[in-house]
Amino acid sequence: MTQKHPQTLVVDAPLSDAERLKRESNFLRGTIAEDLNDGLTGGFNGDNSTLIRFHGMYQQDDRDIRAERAEEKLEPRYAMMLRCRLPGGIISPEQWLKMDSFASEKTLYGSIRLTNRQTFQFHGILKKDLKTVHHLLHESGLDSLATANDVNRNVLCTSNPVESDLHAEAYEWAKKISEHLLPQTHAYAEIWLDQEKLATTDQEPILGATYLPRKFKTTVVIPPQNDVDIYANDLNFIAISENDQLVGFNVLIGGGLSITIGDKTTHPGVAKDIGYIEKEKVLAVAEAVVTTQRDWGNRSNRKNARLRYTLERVGLDVFKAEVEKRAGVTFEASRPFTLTGRGDRFGWVKGIDNQWHLTLFVENGRLLDYPHRPLKSGIAEIAKVHKGDFRLTANQNLIVAGVSEEDKDTIEKIARDHGLLENISELRKNSMACVSFPTCPLAMAEAERFLPNFLTKVEAVMTKYDIADEYIVFRTTGCPNNCGRSLLAEIGLVGRAIGRYNLYIGGDRVGTRIPRLFRENITEDEILSEVDSLIGRWAKERDGKEAFGDFVVRAGIVKAVTDPAIDFYD
């Protein structure tokens, strides 16, 4: 990253309207409670439709029928998407069964969507059922606070069931970080849980009265796995162990993938290393990074408000020095670590505690009862007999964790009977798509509904070139916000319009390199033609087991992106 001498630590420009909204919200209350009682509309009005995001919900409508309803002079079919706060992705079978019942009985789509941020979403909750789901979450020991908007989002932690002791400690740090950085406002409890308003004035000592300039994403990773995609997140703690004991963390800051097509002041970025800390300093450092971004981040232009842009504006060293000052730490030189891959370990693996763990592939995270493949019911049936826990992965899959030797056969039979243990190609296992249509209001092209059939065609190409057992990290996202993390894939598709995508190639398998734009605004047939040609060359010309992304760079098909702030658009 190019170091700059800061002209000013704070952007001197008029604040965006989002800042007005937060300032006037009375610590995220707005008039949400009044809107809940408005039976004339299925949605929330004005600022409230944005404020509910801080409470973990997005107002959406079914875009498949939007035009039809408009012709009939009806408002869109508004329904809410709710995202649970689940640091580290661990949920008990008892909790899961309650969530499963709600999805079946109280949502328009009857599904549970696993996300690539290790949690789950309900799509299609009617306004009248919102308090029901929040009470259900609360009674189950869960909530949805701060899973969206300008706060620290759900904290990720490597899904590592094998090294159980190390994972347990890393997971506890993920939970502690999540709790430490949560909003302190009582608004969530007042509005959704009917708790009485406190006589004291709300305080937000970490996030501040207007919260953060933009979303903020945090991870804890246990090398060599990079399933949580550390380089795509604002704040990352890389676990360093000695003699199988956690001793501290390397800290990386400033990753992010969202861009705005046509605006070259926006670009993706990979997180940068700022040094090593002892584990006891984690919360102090997390707070210092967040508060420095709170104070220095761009509150004028939301497109340039993420931490990576703050680092570019003030300089990485300046930001690091401020974090050291606020946290009362001095970063040591980073400890060496190695990343070997991002994929999940499917099937049964045995942990050092002699417990078994079964990782199940859930295509694009959608748990639904399909004809002949009742996936959602299968997980529920497993939950009824499972004595361990479930772990949701950052690849949108699910681990049945902590299975005893005597329970293995029972769990496996349920999974197999419900289509949860089918033979899946390596390509498909390493794929990912965001939700996109019909529920996402930002979607420009299909993603989740597009990728499965398209991958079938790519699998045929792999078979044609006799490399069906190989894989490419292949991701699709419906818009440039990049929720599907396409801009850290070997092949990434970014939606531009219905049936059209930008094609990016040249990322690496472990997730350290941004891919480059190869073809712009092309159709599915054109994408398949390009991919066929590229895979053909890779199969023929690669160096041994050279990965696809590394090959297209070495062969000169695209130039590697080395510093996205400078050369992403070259």
Curated annotation (Swiss-Prot):
Cited Gene3D superfamilies: Sulfite Reductase Hemoprotein, domain 1 (3.30.413.10)
4Fe-4S found in the keyword field: yes
GO cellular component entries: sulfite reductase complex (NADPH)
Residues given in the record as [4Fe-4S] cluster binding sites: C434, C440, C479, C483
Catalysed reactions listed for this entry: hydrogen sulfide + 3 NADP(+) + 3 H2O = sulfite + 3 NADPH + 4 H(+)
Needed co-factor(s): siroheme; [4Fe-4S] cluster
Binding residues for siroheme: C483
PROSITE patterns: NIR_SIR
EC number(s) on file: 1.8.1.2
Key words of the record: 4Fe-4S, Amino-acid biosynthesis, Cysteine biosynthesis, Heme, Iron, Iron-sulfur, Metal-binding, NADP, Oxidoreductase
A molecular function (GO) term: 4 iron, 4 sulfur cluster binding
Pathway: Sulfur metabolism; hydrogen sulfide biosynthesis; hydrogen sulfide from sulfite (NADPH route): step 1/1
Keyword Iron: yes
SUPFAM superfamilies: Nitrite and sulphite reductase 4Fe-4S domain-like, Nitrite/Sulfite reductase N-terminal domain-like
GO BP, one annotated term: cysteine biosynthetic process
Cofactor-binding details, from the entry: Binds 1 siroheme per subunit.
Function, as annotated: Component of the sulfite reductase complex that catalyzes the 6-electron reduction of sulfite to sulfide. This is one of several activities required for the biosynthesis of L-cysteine from sulfate.
Oligomeric and partner information: Alpha(8)-beta(8). The alpha component is a flavoprotein, the beta component is a hemoprotein.
Protein family per UniProt: Belongs to the nitrite and sulfite reductase 4Fe-4S domain family.
Protein name per UniProt: Sulfite reductase [NADPH] hemoprotein beta-component
Originating organism: Zymomonas mobilis subsp. mobilis (strain ATCC 31821 / ZM4 / CP4)
Lineage of the organism: Bacteria, Pseudomonadati, Pseudomonadota, Alphaproteobacteria, Sphingomonadales
